[in-house]
Amino acid sequence: MPLPQVRATTILAVRRNGQVAIGGDGQVSVGDTVAKQRAVKVRTLKGGRVLAGFAGSVADALTLFEKFEEKLERYPGNLPRASVELAKEWRSDRVLRRLEAMLIVADVEHGFMLSGNGELIEPDDGILAIGSGGAYAQAAARALMRETQLPPRDIVEKALTIAGEICIYTNTNITVLEPTR
């Protein structure tokens, strides 16, 4: 009998007017059961200047965070280069290629979505979303960006709340981070 699928998360990052915020919900589901309600799937890196969040396997994501931190050390202050180098290694390394996670990384200048199949996307509108409720959070964030002057933190909170009201694999126990100055 196959193990039930672990479904975890909605992660959203928003950049606007020289500010950035990233957030994630707290739900982890195993099959059709909520296994955890207050998981934290976002963190700060590089002394608080870089924000990161993951969807997918926790162990795989932690491995990728370590690899990404190595890239940030090798290319200090250059989030685009560190992201490209991680995407290249993730895609070409036999072990890393099997990791089942997606990452969002962002600072005040750039934001990227990375995946193991070689995807490296920097959106035009400064909105990045991954995970089971990602499309709902992205749609809500786009509407809030177009129709309000809210700062990124508020957009992330409100959009993730909306996603949590729609997606059964997303809740409203939200963690939001901003870079430290």
UniProtKB/Swiss-Prot annotation:
Name of the protein: ATP-dependent protease subunit HslV
Active-site annotation: T9
Gene Ontology biological process terms from the UniProt entry: proteolysis involved in protein catabolic process
Listed Pfam families: Proteasome
Cellular component terms (Gene Ontology): HslUV protease complex; proteasome core complex
Enzyme Commission code(s) on record: 3.4.25.2
PANTHER family: ATP-DEPENDENT PROTEASE SUBUNIT HSLV (PTHR32194:SF0), METALLOPROTEASE TLDD (PTHR32194)
InterPro entries named among the record's database cross-references: ATP-dep_Prtase_HsIV_su, Ntn_hydrolases_N, Proteasome_sua/b, Proteasome_suB-type
Principal location: cytoplasm
Binding site for Na(+): G164, C167, T170
Top EC group: hydrolase
Regulation of protein activity: Allosterically activated by HslU binding.
The entry's keywords: Allosteric enzyme, Cytoplasm, Hydrolase, Metal-binding, Protease, Sodium, Threonine protease
Similarity annotation: Belongs to the peptidase T1B family. HslV subfamily.
Keyword Hydrolase: yes
